Amino acid sequence: MIQNKNRQPDLYPVKGRYSPGEPVSLMLETPPDFADEVAITCMHLEVCLFEARCPVTGGKEQILLPEFPGDFLGLGVRARLYKDGALRATLYTAADISEPGRVVRYGFLSDFAAEDADDDGDVASMAKYHINLVQFYDWSYRHDQLVPPSEEYQDMMGKRNSLQCVRRKIDACHARGMGSTAYAAVYAASRPFWEEHRDWGLYALPGKPLVFIDTFYFMNIAETCPWHGHIIEQYRNVMAEVGFDGIHMDTYGYPKTALNAAGEPCELKEQLPKLIEDTAAKLRVGDREPR
């Protein structure tokens, strides 16, 4: 829950994004006896779209604005607080009215412990700052097996996660107009996976695998390597089984060039676009584009 610890009046959107035609809900927080009336003015650029006055009782109160037509509409909101007819404070906020993916303001989550499953305060805080797409960082089981085999699990760095928590955070994002993307490196694998698929790996020198922090083994993303299809299938599993809206396909910034298992040079700048295109094609469902 968002708490106004300073006991100062505050105004903020309940959602990071509102769909066209959806009523806009705002949260007004005021200390007890601070105000008895609020005057709301909604603007788009210099055009006034809506004005209203309503009583204030103190504490947290939701203000429901009407539907506003059109897509890609930035709504500026001013709230003037009055007590016995005297102006006490003027507050400002904004609301984004747009279709999913029209504009992106990116946030992230990284805590998915079982004890956090019922706490959506982090997501509520991001809505306050108009975040509309959230990356779930380090949520997965393994980089080569993203979906965990059990409800509670440890990731490759030993962090304990809960799949129930991940799913509830996704639901919390959706309830606040935010999409969710699953962090997933495009070419990282665990040592056991690499040992079983050495011919899928990338190498600094013949026989010398590329490894990041002695943990993540680089794999060959070329279309001709089975890793290409393997990681795309992992992405499909993530969306189908966990409920994410898309994938954050991460790279580590290097290497630019490496060797495949046969000692042949691989130019990643040529291979990454193809991996992205193939992933988008596999994850597309009807007219729904992955995020």
Predicted features and spans:
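Aromatic/hydrophobic beta-strand junction motif of beta-rich domains
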Residues: V24-P32
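Active-site neighborhood of glycoside hydrolase catalytic domains
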Residues: E223-R291
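Extended acidic/polar, glycine-enriched regions
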Residues: L49-R102
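Hydrophobic faces of well-ordered beta-strands that scaffold small-molecule active sites
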Residues: R105-F108, V134-F136, S180-A182, I247-M249, ...
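An acidic-aromatic substrate-binding cleft motif
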Residues: A89-R142
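Short, compositionally biased P/S/T/A/G/V-rich stretches that sit at domain boundaries
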Residues: M1-P20
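Aromatic-lined carbohydrate-binding/catalytic grooves of carbohydrate-active enzymes
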Residues: D122-R167, Y187-D214, A222-E223, K256-T257, ...
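Active-site-adjacent "subsite" loops/lids of carbohydrate-active enzymes
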Residues: E99-R102, F112-D116, A182-V242
